[in-house]
């Protein structure tokens, strides 16, 4: 029974015609085993491809010798022989060589990139500058412009007077501490002490401000003695006037 099954298969599928290379839709150039012309089994089977003898004329004269009807009706691509593929690859190689061998100035496929870059540059140049907020202390001061007078509050004046009575000359470290404590600048504290020393010299009729605390205490003592003498003098005059009036 098995031999019957095998024989039926062999009689149904023959080895010569059924195993041809052009059985599928896309035929290759490999000549068929039977030596017969290729037969297409696609949807366009009206006309068959030409014999292999016409290939030399086709590749010798160019693409114009290719049959127009076969080109339109053949559904699949045609496989070319070895020499034909060599010619085609050679032409592609020449085209690639001429393409890559051209100078950079001849390339126009990247022109749009240059246009985009130039457009971005124009946009950046035409953009308005950023207007940042400027505070009064950030603006440059003119040379001929006169500064306004600084007004001190009662608390600031009281603290500065206390510091002046303790020490009329401030060190740099102490001046920084006072300026931070009173919310003033070092320059403002320095100017206030200079003006205060000038005022003291006018009040005491001195050409020079005492450089030490001892000198300042001595001056204060003399001032107190002078005030006491003047008071005694005025009181004596009043007593003499009162005695003369009683007489």
Swiss-Prot record:
GO molecular function: DNA-binding transcription factor activity, RNA polymerase II-specific; RNA polymerase II transcription regulatory region sequence-specific DNA binding
Name of the protein this chain belongs to: Homeobox protein Hox-B8b
Source lineage: Eukaryota, Metazoa, Chordata, Craniata, Vertebrata
Species per Swiss-Prot/TrEMBL record: Danio rerio
Keywords of the record: Developmental protein, DNA-binding, Homeobox, Nucleus, Transcription, Transcription regulation
PROSITE patterns: ANTENNAPEDIA, HOMEOBOX_1, HOMEOBOX_2
UniProt function note: Sequence-specific transcription factor which is part of a developmental regulatory system that provides cells with specific positional identities on the anterior-posterior axis.
Covalent S-S links between cysteines: none
Listed Basic and acidic residues bias regions: 204-236
